[in-house]
Regions:
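Membrane-interface "cap" regions at the ends of multi-pass membrane proteins
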Residues: 1-47, 51-56, 68-73, 85, ...
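Extracellular loop-to-transmembrane helix junctions
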Residues: 21, 44-140, 253, 259-260, ...
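Membrane-interface loop-to-helix entry segments
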Residues: 124, 137-194, 224, 247-255, ...
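C-terminal membrane-solvent junction of multi-pass transporters and transport-like membrane proteins
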Residues: 164-165, 336-343, 384-436
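Helix-loop-helix connectors at the membrane interface of multi-pass transporters/channels
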Residues: 1-4, 8, 89-94, 99, ...
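Helix-loop-helix junctions that connect adjacent transmembrane segments
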Residues: 15-20, 57-58, 132-135, 167-302
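TM-loop-TM module centered on a large, flexible mid-protein loop between adjacent transmembrane helices
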Residues: 90-92, 97, 129, 215, ...
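A generic transmembrane alpha-helix motif of multi-pass inner-membrane proteins
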Residues: 183-184, 374, 378-386, 414-481
Length: 481
């Protein structure tokens, strides 16, 4: 053996690993794609939108669902052609410019990193309600550390946890749909809720068309997460096939789980029912009470606890992978792309992404969660910014691929007209949010945050910061053909 071999081995041993190992199976991705659109916003938060718009909130969920379906179709087209852990952030980089990928990547990371703290807070409150001997912040810390350990292990562990979290949520929704359908058909033997009476008894749109528009803006927050599967698919054996399958299924998932559930609720429960807007009750709790289900609050709290743990788990995974992708492109410190040699997990990114959760635990312990609420306001419209970036990226990438004669395996419908329609709808929604006032602060705070990040991205692009990492990642510049 050459004497250079031992030296070569030492060099390799001292060189940080920067490759993901993968390991997600098809069943993991299937359930992750379902879990991505089912969260506490459905089980509890939807009550606020129902109280706002009445039964016509169904139109808001249908409208929001259509927008998400179109955004996922556009993202699916790009992801099948070029699977990447950075997903839409990478595509924005290639199609629009480095500043765009930089901005949307960091905004998306901020959203999920901050959301983890809120999920830990909710989990802590639920567990404290069950077992009051331990303070809520103690339970929040326990949840944070436990799921941090899960994400430190290989990606298959994350997939397994998310599979079972998602399964619990799916079973809960299916049972609710069955019970609700029986009640609508006058076949449910318990409770006071039977038939369709509340759908029109106080008017289908009691607060006017404007309330539906405002509710639609709130609904958009609930749908974010559907795109996570395009990030995770890059760590599977056949990313293209998995993305096609899950993207096609997003239509029935949104129709069944969201529109179906909300339709049953507004039929069985008056839109002004006490408890719909209370955090301690929520949509499913009020509906189950109407169906005469004993211990409804305990059941819903268990489902919500599962949902927030699932969301925390997905948030930590997604945030760490976005940091990894940003680092690979020279848009974050290169230490963020270091992965474990055995696990292939970007453990530095996982740890950094969890810091907001630990900050939330500290704020809970010191009664300063109002500060966290202010930070959360800057996340309110990030979903719309993400969908806008997806639409512009798909528009540019499709035009370039068509010019080169590339045949796409998965395509956006009615291109470019539906893409233009999505852009117009999102811009109109943002303008409406500013004019109407209910979500004005969210738009302003998110826009300020985005403006700061855009400026940083432009500086990085102009001065060539991180160009070595970009060259190693073999990223074509946005204007390349």
């Amino acid at each position: 053996m050459s004497p250079a071999h031992p030296e070569r081995r030492r060099q390799l041993a001292n060189t940080p690993n920067t490759e993901l190992k993968g390991g997600l199976k098809s069943r993991h991705l299937t359930m992750m794609s379902i879990a991505g659109v089912i969260g506490a916003a459905l089980f509890v938060g939807s009550g606020k939108q129902i109280a706002l718009a009445g039964p016509a909130v169904i139109l808001a969920y249908v409208g929001g669902g259509i927008l998400v379906i179109l955004a996922m179709r556009m993202l699916g087209e790009m992801a099948v052609a070029q699977p990447d852990t950075g997903s839409f952030s990478t595509y924005a980089d290639r199609a629009i410019g480095r500043w765009a990928g930089f901005t949307i990547g960091w905004l998306y990371w901020y959203f999920w990193a901050l959301l983890m703290g809120w999920e830990a807070y909710v989990a802590g409150q639920i567990l404290h309600g069950w077992f009051p001997l331990v303070p809520a912040w103690g339970y929040a810390l326990l949840v944070t550390v436990s799921l941090l350990i899960v994400n430190f292990l290989n990606v298959r562990n994350y997939g397994e946890f998310e599979f079972w979290f998602a399964l619990i949520k799916v079973v809960a929704i299916v049972l609710f749909l069955v019970m609700g359908s029986l009640a609508l058909a006058h076949l449910w033997p318990w409770g006071e809720a039977n038939g369709w009476s509340h759908l029109t008894s106080q008017g289908f749109m009691p607060n006017g068309p404007k309330s539906v528009v405002v509710a639609l803006l709130g609904v958009m927050f609930a749908f974010i997460g559907a795109e996570i599967v395009t990030v995770a698919a890059a760590e599977s054996a056949d990313p293209g096939r998995e993305i096609i399958k899950t993207t096609r299924s997003v239509v029935w998932r949104i129709c069944l789980f969201y529109v179906g559930s909300i339709f049953i609720v507004v039929c069985l429960v008056p839109y002004n029912a006490p408890g719909l807007t209370e955090p301690t009750h929520g949509t499913y709790n009020v509906a189950l009470d109407a169906l005469g289900i004993p211990h409804a609050q305990l059941i819903v709290n268990f489902i919500v606890l599962t949902s927030v743990c699932s969301c925390f788990n997905s948030a930590l995974y997604t945030a760490s992978r976005m940091l990894y992708s940003l680092a690979r492109r020279g848009d974050a410190h290169r230490i963020m792309q270091i992965t474990g040699r055995k696990t292939g997990t970007p453990y530095v990114g996982v740890l950094i992404s969890s810091l907001f959760a630990f900050a939330a635990v500290w704020m809970m312990a010191t009664s300063k969660m109002d500060v966290y609420d202010v930070l959360m306001q800057a996340t309110g419209t990030i979903a719309l910014f993400v969908y806008l970036a997806i639409a512009f990226s798909q528009l540019r990438m499709r035009q370039r691929l068509q010019a080169r004669g590339v045949r796409l395996e998965f395509r956006m419908w009615l291109f470019p007209w539906l893409t233009y329609a999505v852009i117009v709808c999102i811009v109109a929604a943002l303008v409406t949010m500013v004019i109407e006032g209910t979500y004005r602060n969210e738009v302003v705070y998110t826009s300020i945050l985005a403006g700061v990040i855009v400026a940083m991205g432009i500086v990085a692009q102009v001065f060539g910061i991180g160009t070595r990492a970009r060259a190693e990642a073999e990223l074509a510049p946005a204007g390349a053909e």
